[in-house]
Amino acid sequence: MNPKFGGLDLAQRVDNSALVVLELDEGVLKQVGQKVWAHIDYSLIFKSLAKINELEKFNKISYDRTGVGDAVAKLISPPMRKICRPVVLTIKKKFELITLVKGLFNEKKLSIHDRDLFREVTEQEVVTSDAGNLLYRHPQGFHDDRFWALALACDAGSYAVRGITKARAIAASPREMN
C-alpha cells in the first residue's frame, strides 16, 4: 500500500473547505481524490475526515489553522491527532508552499488529474503590494480552496517524495563494537 497524504484548507468566511488526497507512487505524488465542503461547521468536516481516513489510511494530513486557532484542534478525534499537523499560512509559508508545488510539478514529482484543480494552480498570480511586497492571489470571483489543500498535501508528503524522513526522537540501542 502506497503512502497517502492529505491537505485540508478550512473555510473562514465565504470560501469552501477542501481536502486533496495525494498518493506517493514510484516517487510521484499523484492526486487520487478530493472533497469540497460548502461552508459548514468544522466539527462536521472533521467527522467526515475521520471517515475518509478509514478508507484512505493517511500517513499525514496538513491542515490550515490560520485564523481558526486552537479551537479547531479540539475537534480532531484522538486517533486523527496523530496524523493531523496544523500549519499557519503566513505570507512566508504561502511562498514556501507555492514554491514547493511548482518545484514538484516542474520535477514531474506531482501529478494532478482534476482539470478544475489544475486550473486553480495555473490561476495563481504574482502581484506587488503597495508596500512593494510580492503577493500571490487568485483572480477575483474564483476560489482557491483546492489549490491550498493541494499545497498543504504536498507539504505533508514532501519529505517522503524526496526520500527524506523527518527527524524523530527514538530510543536507540547501543552499537556493538567488534
Model-predicted segments: where are they?
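RNase H-like, metal-dependent nuclease domains and their acidic two-metal-ion catalytic environment used
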Residues: M1-L89, F95, T99, G103, ...
